[in-house]
C-alpha cells in the first residue's frame, strides 16, 4: 500500500525496506521475517531488504514497512531528537559569550537552510492506507497552513485515485502469490 502511494508521489517504483534490528536474515521476530519473505517474492514491489533504525533518515529506502507501534515510536523518537538538537544549538547561540558569538556565526546559515529543507507545515498529515476512501491524519500541533497542505494532499489523492490504485496493486501482489 505504501509502495503504491509513494509511486504516485515519486513517479517511479519506490525502494521498499522492512525495519529490523539488523540486516541479516536471521534477525527479527517472526512477523518481520515473514513480511520480508513475502515482499521479496513479488515483482510488483521493489524490495531492497532490511533497514535498521539508524538508516531511516539516510535515503536507503523510500518506503519503510513496520507495524504501527514501532512506526509511531520511530517517528516520535526522531521528532524528539531533532527538537533536542535544535534546543541545544539555540541555547549555545543565545549565550552572550564568545562561544555564543562563534556559534551564531557558524550556525545561522545552516539553520536557514534547514528551515527550508522539511518545513513541518508543508509535510503535515499521514495518509491512512487500506481504506476505500481518503483519510489524512494531521499532527496534533498542526496550524492552519499545515491543515491546508493536508487537505491539498487529500485532493491530490482523490484526483490520482489512490485508493483504487492501491487496491489494484494489492490484487496484483495477491494474485502473483497464488500462481
Feature map (PLM): residue ranges:
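Glycine-rich phosphate/nucleotide-binding loop
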Residues: 60-64, 68-179
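Glycine-rich beta-alpha junction loops
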Residues: 20-25, 51-55, 67-71, 140-143
